[in-house]
């Protein structure tokens, strides 16, 4: 509510999660991957191993290369191929899939033992969150559409599809 009222009044509000979701909605974002893990965001262990992200640093099972030798592009391509949203059949009928993309790989690994598994334990929460953000977006579009123009000039970080 605070974020929405600030946007309608043309003021900055620091709740970036809402702003990012509204930006994704405004720009028609449809994510093939939930985050930058294995794409542009990677983690490095103290031994120099490069992993999917900071949460997997030190895990041999999620290693994509080393600082010395660089990223193993074949391993990276295999990871991206198997983790593409199109392969998450549990998500195939979900209306929130373009913004969620199945959720965090580390959470899936921790909860299900499989990074390819969609995070089904928080689907209802994600749908509720997306619904709230859609309603906030609609009200801002109705009451202060000029506020949304900032997203016309500021593209999101490119998502791999």
Model-based region annotation:
Residues 10, 47, 86-161:
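Radical SAM enzyme core and accessory elements
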């Amino acid at each position: 509510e605070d974020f929405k009222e600030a946007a309608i009044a043309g003021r900055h509000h620091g709740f970036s999660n809402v702003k990012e979701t509204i930006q994704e909605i405004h720009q028609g974002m449809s994510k093939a991957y939930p985050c930058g893990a294995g794409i542009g965001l990677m983690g490095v262990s103290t031994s120099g191993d490069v992993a999917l992200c900071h949460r997997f640093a030190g895990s041999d099972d999620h290693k994509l290369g080393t600082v010395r030798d660089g990223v193993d592009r074949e391993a990276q391509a295999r990871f991206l191929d198997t983790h593409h949203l199109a392969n998450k059949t549990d998500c195939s009928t979900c209306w929130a899939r373009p913004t969620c993309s199945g959720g965090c790989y580390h959470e899936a690994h921790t909860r299900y033992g499989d990074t390819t598994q969609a995070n089904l334990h928080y689907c209802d929460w994600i749908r509720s969150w997306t619904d709230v953000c859609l309603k906030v977006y609609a009200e801002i579009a109705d009451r202060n559409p000029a506020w949304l123009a900032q997203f016309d000039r500021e593209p999101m970080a490119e998502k791999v599809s």
